[in-house]
């Protein structure tokens, strides 16, 4: 599969979909992801660490992803199983679907917070690995949020609010796993069986076609992979799915988690799969915390603060990628307070310094550093130095690319002088990085 692979092979049948990456996506810099489902009711996982930092032989039993609760609660000896037995008496997972009310959910309120970050696109989960769909998906026999639980078309509400807020709308769909459709044992190791049969491939195909028909998403964000039986061309194949998508949404994009088939951009996750963060268009995704789904065990020590998130955003953009930052809604539909605080902090920063990331590209001739923390981006003939250090800072410019007489902090000119192959600027104290901009001499 293409996910995390450094040299995936695009089969001949999928070469027809190769095209330049649309500028709206390339310049977006920031997208916001939302994970929300029945797993938001228990909202429980061990906050063990980031994907890529937790040993693989411990990952599944001690999974920090709360959205994996339906799997982790079935693993013998896992803390999630012990928690489930103690708190819920071993009740079936679908009890959480019926207990999920979304009583405080207002899509417009959520999107107002999202839009204030400056994000260019928004992607909610439509079906995660538990198989519950957040719209009235075909052949789900009522196991969806229209017939049970919230009794609402949550995807339709998200789509309308996203477009009203001026953002591009995407949909996440887990094609690689469905713990309800297929009666398979819990996943407790890499390489565990996953649904690959034709029945599931056609079921998933019909779901995504329905999402395209109803909501015209700008982004198809698949996960894990696609069932093997659906890869070869055919009437309900992934080839047909992509043909349908691009015919309806010509400037749409898809990620690389559809098996070894087609992608418009590569993805990494937390600190896993970072080898793909070169060359091609790419996107790093992670939660504000250690989980994508809301996890009641997470505290501020497990979450990105606003300054942390800003540094991550700038770092990703300075290397040519987009950041897809996730929030996990509470079961009620509220954004958790600590996650909201981070989003609001991002918005405050982008209101002042967003010109250094939105529509920006790397400036490879300038060198990043950790001391002081410094990243470089470029928009047109302007180069931006994003600095996280107060006081007098020396910005290395040995080749004289920058015109120091044009130094600006936002719209305000600032003093700058050249000395010993560097430009010296004075930076006021602040909680988050600042962007100093220069006209390039090239």
Where are these regions (language model features)?
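Mature catalytic domains of secreted/periplasmic carbohydrate-active enzymes
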Residues: 2-442
